[in-house]
Amino acid sequence: MDLPIEDSHDSSTSPKGKQPTTAEKSATKKEDKVPVKKQKTRTVFSSTQLCVLNDRFQRQKYLSLQQMQELSNILNLSYKQVKTWFQNQRMKSKRWQKNNWLKNSNGVTQGCLVNPTGNLPMWSNQTWNNSIWSNETQNIQSWSNHSWNTQTWCTQSWNNQAWNSPFYNCGEESLQSCMQFQPNSPASDLEAALEAAGEGLNVIQQTARYFSTPQTMDLFLNYSTNMQPEDV
């Protein structure tokens, strides 16, 4: 009995296996090429180099290209090493100044809020200051009242002196002599009396201009109005 012969598949006629896609190929390539970070070589400075660098940084924080090259030649360092060191020192200096400023500002704020006495409330000092201010205000008001009273007293004294002055008495005497003139006197006596009265009026006018007081002006007007109808 013959067995059935299986069909043998040739390589040329056999179906091809499934090939990977381009995305899978790129993923495998990325997995194979894992990026390795290069560690930066840290420069180790000697004590002499650090001493020279710190001294130069205290005197000058920014160096020119020529100055950095000269300093690198003196210290047997590269230009990049000197430049990097100065950049790092400037950053450290700015950070230190900022932290120090924040500490000082916080200390000042806390010192202002703290009560130094610890026993008395804060408004007690304000009340005491207000009482002192009120006392000073009262003293100023009393002084101003005293000054006003002094000025009033001086004005009254000056008016009394003007009222009792010899100029006023002189005018009054001349007017009284004119008022006592008799109508039966001769014409020459009348003219002499009028001249005396005119001189008295001139004195009164000069006195009124000199003192410029309301009492003197009222007196002059009363005498001038009373004298005219009687002398005519």
Curated annotation (Swiss-Prot):
Main location: nucleus
Function, in words: Probable transcriptional regulator.
Matches recorded under InterPro entries: Distal-less_Homeobox_TF, HD, Homeobox_CS, Homeodomain-like_sf
Family membership: Belongs to the Nanog homeobox family.
Organism, scientific name: Pan troglodytes (Chimpanzee)
Keyword Membrane: no
Statement: the UniProt record of this protein carries the keyword Transmembrane: no
Region of interest called Sufficient for strong transactivation activity, as start-end residue ranges on this chain: 168-232
GO biological process, one term: regulation of transcription by RNA polymerase II
Primary gene name: NANOGP1
Protein name: Putative homeobox protein NANOG2
Classification of source organism: Eukaryota, Metazoa, Chordata, Craniata, Vertebrata
UniProt-annotated stretches for the region Sufficient for transactivation activity: 123-167
